[in-house]
Amino acid sequence: MAMDPKYFRNTLGRFATGVTVVTVNDGEISRGMTANAFSSVSLDPPLILVCVDEKATCLEMIRNAKKFNVNFLAEEQKEISDWFAGKGRDAEDQFSELEYDMGENATPVLKGNIGLLECELYNEVPGGDHVIFIGLVTRALFEEDVKAPLLYYASSYRKMDLDAQFN
């Protein structure tokens, strides 16, 4: 029996995720895409995965560059997430209006992020209408001051109350 794609998507939406922007530079141009299909894979070696739509511009760039960054967005970076997920997706220069630096791997690092992983392409696996890129983490940074992450749940951005903790 075939799964209804909309029902499947809505079910997956009941799993809260952080929001990331995956950035890549192929030596000539930089691109980015919003992604919440991100996960850690292994501590030794340090591996992560990101899932990229087969139609995404970043797909071939990651394959060719063999490197990418994963920027963990802070709560106040909703507009950046929207930019890379929406109208900015097709912009000629996605980074012209944004504050960023180039990482040690010559790939964009968004200013204000709460965490960063610089990765070398370790492997790729087909995954239906997506490609699963596995990255070997070569550099990891995080914001020392705990700041609220940008969350996504039930098709909407959400906030985290950092003062609310389980006993």
Where are these regions (language model features)?
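Basic, polyanion-binding surface patches
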Residues: 1-167
